[in-house]
A protein has these predicted regions:
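Non-catalytic, solvent-exposed segments at the cell envelope interface
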Residues: 1-212
Length: 212
């Protein structure tokens, strides 16, 4: 419906159609920090794009099991040289894993493959606006917070306890760092995992999957 675009997963793929999968699949999920919603208070667009969240989802060949591993975005390492179609090129160098996305998703794929030794078969990239729209289209998600959370930087203000949250609140919960005592990326991963788990639980309900 015009909301989904495709791109080669590797710089040398060109216009090749993806092959039909016959074995296990590794899919890289990228949450972009693109400031598409600058006017709504999500911060200024500094002209770059990084991955706020990175998850490798492994799907077994018989479709009976899905395992997910989250990668800390501040992971430091040697990023490989990369030529991404439509984004220019990167000569490689030492840097944070999340910075590879500014050169395009194929460069993020190359960086994750070098770090993990895994082969990534596909990727899915979503920005702030897409994430909010997805959660709202599902009718919100259910979470349970052990304590209230407030973070003006992420526009987060949630009470403690079980509650249903909308797309804006889910994004704020996944992004908050200042609401946590540690204010670290590792601490933030816990909230991202909570949000992702709630999305999966909501999406797998039969009444959600049959909605147009």
């Amino acid at each position: 419906q015009g909301n989904v675009t495709t791109a080669p997963i590797r710089s040398d793929d060109g216009e090749a159609e993806p092959e039909l999968a016959t074995g296990d699949l590794n899919i890289l999920l990228l949450g972009s920090d693109s400031r598409a919603l600058e006017s709504d208070g999500f911060g200024e667009d500094d002209g770059t794009e990084r991955s706020d969240a990175m998850v490798i989802a492994h799907i077994s060949s018989d479709n009976t099991r899905i395992d997910a591993v989250q990668l800390p975005r501040d992971t430091l390492g040697d990023l490989p040289a990369c030529d991404d179609n439509g984004r220019g090129s990167y000569d490689g160098g030492f840097g944070m894993l999340n910075s590879a996305l500014q050169y395009g998703p194929a460069c993020s794929v190359a960086a994750v493959e070098q770090l993990t030794g895994m082969t990534i078969d596909h990727f899915v990239q979503m920005d702030f606006e897409g994430f909010i729209g997805m959660v709202d289209a599902m009718g919100g998600i259910d979470v349970c917070l052990p304590e209230p959370l407030q973070d003006g930087h992420a526009r987060l203000d949630l009470p403690a306890g079980a509650q249903s949250i909308n797309g804006d609140q889910a994004l704020a919960l996944a992004r908050t760092r200042h609401a946590l005592a540690e204010e670290s990326d590792i601490a933030r991963l816990g909230h991202q995992q909570m949000v992702l788990s709630a999305i999966v639980q909501k999406a797998t309900k039969s009444d959600v999957l049959v909605r147009p």
